[in-house]
């Protein structure tokens, strides 16, 4: 059922944990939604930051690189995400410069299945790697803080982000950090003393994916194993979201 060249990934496992139905439509049925300005904002911001770091660009040229990337990726230039991406890219660059020279950017690592007792390898792509640490950049519209100024622990760090970074730390044998950044705010969070649970959760998701797809005879069998609900940000906010329309038909057809 899974393609021969299938690779696990942190994003795939997190989707499976948070919303099995969304994992099903994207990984088994190949659904791809339209460009999302908020996601493109993050892609453009980190690209601009990397260009700024690697080429020693000033703010003006970082903004230029960020805008070009945003538009090239399909972002709507008339939406607020473009301006936020430009501002975030500068804040990314300023913070990341403190870690020294970038050793690798968007490095791909593919593990052997045996490393974690799996049937399929894991594909990991890290953002900014330095000599002593790997930093994963997270662009956001705003950071939710408590009245005393600290980040709201109910929101940060996000469990899915921690699972991803604990996996990357193990695969690369190097400490990892998260850098949450909005146009007006920023916070770095390390992965020290997180324990083994986040890593165990993501490996467990990989194993569940392999088990379910091995015992099911068809994709429709997998669909019938899980109820369809839209209680996750991946499904958007409106009833006519393309992903919701696509999923409804899949579930209806599976139960005919």
Question: Each predicted region: which residue ranges?
Answer:
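Hydrophobic/aromatic-lined pockets within catalytic cores
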Residues: 29, 50-57, 139-142, 170-173, ...
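Short catalytic/ligand-binding loop motif for oxyanion handling, primarily in non-cytosolic enzymes
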Residues: 33, 142-146, 185-188
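Metal-dependent nuclease catalytic cores that hydrolyze phosphodiester bonds in DNA/RNA
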Residues: 1-126, 256
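Short amphipathic alpha-helical face segments that pack within enzyme cores
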Residues: 44, 163-171
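Short glycine/proline-enriched coil/turn segments at helix->beta-strand junctions
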Residues: 101, 130-133, 171-175
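Non-catalytic protein-protein interaction segments used by genome-maintenance enzymes to assemble
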Residues: 110-164
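Metal-dependent nuclease catalytic regions and adjoining charged, substrate-binding loops involved
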Residues: 170-256
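Flexible, glycine- and charge-enriched loops at secondary-structure boundaries
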Residues: 38, 154-158, 192-195, 199
């Amino acid at each position: 059922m899974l393609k021969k060249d299938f690779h696990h990934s942190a994003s795939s496992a997190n989707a499976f944990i948070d919303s099995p139905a969304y994992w099903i439509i994207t990984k088994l049925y190949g659904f791809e939604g339209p460009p999302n300005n908020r996601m493109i904002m993050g892609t453009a911001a980190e690209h601009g930051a990397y260009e700024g770091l690697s080429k020693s660009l000033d703010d003006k040229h970082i903004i230029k690189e960020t805008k070009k990337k945003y538009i090239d990726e399909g972002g709507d230039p008339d939406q607020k995400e473009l301006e936020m991406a430009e501002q975030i890219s500068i804040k990314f660059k300023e913070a990341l410069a403190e870690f020294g020279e970038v050793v690798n950017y968007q490095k791909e690592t593919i593990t052997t299945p045996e490393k974690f007792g799996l049937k399929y390898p894991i594909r990991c792509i890290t953002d900014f790697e330095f000599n002593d640490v790997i930093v994963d950049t997270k662009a956001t519209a705003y950071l939710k803080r408590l009245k005393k100024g600290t980040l709201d622990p109910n929101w940060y760090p996000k469990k899915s982000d921690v699972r991803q970074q604990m996996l990357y730390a193990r695969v690369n044998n190097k400490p990892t950090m998260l850098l949450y950044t909005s146009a007006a705010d920023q916070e770095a969070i390390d992965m020290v003393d997180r324990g083994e649970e986040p890593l165990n959760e993501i490996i467990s998701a990989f194993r569940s994916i392999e088990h379910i797809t091995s015992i099911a005879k068809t994709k429709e069998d997998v669909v019938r194993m899980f109820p369809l609900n839209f209680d996750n940000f991946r499904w958007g906010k409106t009833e006519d979201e393309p992903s919701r329309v696509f999923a409804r038909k899949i579930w209806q057809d599976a139960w005919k």
